[in-house]
Amino acid sequence: MKHLITGGSGFLGNLIAHRLLASGEEVRILDIWEDPSRPPEIEFVRCDVRDATGVGNAMRGIDIVHHNAALVPLTKSGKDFARVNIDGSRIVAEQAAGRVRAFIHMSSSAVYGSPACPITAETPYRPIEIYGRAKLAGELAVREVCEKHGTALTVIRPRTILGPGRLGIFQILFEWIAAGQNIFVIGDGNVKFQFVHAGDLIDAYMLALRLGKPGIYNVGAARFGTLREALENLVCHAHSTSRVRSLPAGPAIRTLRALDFLGLSPLAPWHYLTYHKPFYFDVNALLQLGWRPRYSNDDMFRESYDWFLANRRAAGAAKDGSPHRRRVREGVLWLLKKIA
């Protein structure tokens, strides 16, 4: 079969493309940025998802669409969140309608906001910031189009992703730990907090694809503890002199919101409004389907940190492409190093 991956040059889309290629599938990527390391066997189409004509042309001969193109919280894109994550998603779904066998939509845990845990597919949607609201509206737009045209729809909602090559805000965390700088949590950090390894996520993704069973799949680690435990265990693994320090939740959130508004911090509302609260999925439904995740929170943090150290120079030089695959500026967060 032939697959079209929107956002296929991004961190996750790139992994999906390589896994499909390794499985003997034909792959076409649609993205505004071309990864220079893209294998020649993977076809590339330079196109914005808001370009209906270009997207329609890219659909020719496609059996399955994998919609991963999106603006992520780190981009702080304001009104463009709606233009890309909502309007762009609708355009991709409309251009796929009546032409493909199935549509797989990459959603986000941000659609839930900050609900009671564990989170299931039945948990109400209550996004609390601009990114989550745009992702939810985009998902609902895709669902509306797919239902209207009878397109089989699978929705994947991952927890925060870790793994080799994942940079973004994790690059700041890893640099601080490597330098022995103290790291900070909002509140005491003693909240159950789930991540997901990119490899486990792709395994779940491919399982859903193979089963051909439309529906919603929430994907997160099966083994995890608190956020503080994950960070303290990583510091121990790194043999670092860093310490995990607590910031009072109220003042910290107000300060980070002001810095965000002024464009002085890389942290977006999704980060500072949720990382001090419990957040984890119930993944029993996936386990019953045969999904076998390999990584705990601690495992994935260790592997990601070790990859970062081994590839630090190249990772620091990356300036183009997905925000999750390149360096992020600290902004005024560097001041925390001075006062810690």
Describe the function of each predicted region.
Residues A208-A268, R302-E303, R312-D320, W334-A340:
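Mid/C-terminal beta-alpha module of Rossmann-like enzyme folds, strongest
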Residues H3-S23:
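N-terminal Rossmann NAD(P)H-binding glycine-rich loop of SDR-like oxidoreductase domains
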Residues V145-F193, A198-D200, L234-V235:
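NAD(P)-dependent short-chain dehydrogenase/reductase
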Residues I91-I130, C146:
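Conserved Rossmann-fold NAD(P)-dependent oxidoreductase catalytic core, especially the SDR/UDP-sugar
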Residues I128-T154:
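Active-site Tyr-X1-5-Lys
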Residues L136, H149-T151, L162-I172, A198, ...:
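Glycine/proline-rich active-site loop of Rossmann-fold NAD(P)-dependent oxidoreductases
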Residues A198, E232, D260-R292:
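Conserved C-terminal active-site "lid" loop/helix of NAD(P)H-dependent oxidoreductases
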Residues P36, V49-D87, Q95-A97:
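NAD(P)H-binding glycine-rich loop region in Rossmannoid oxidoreductase-like domains
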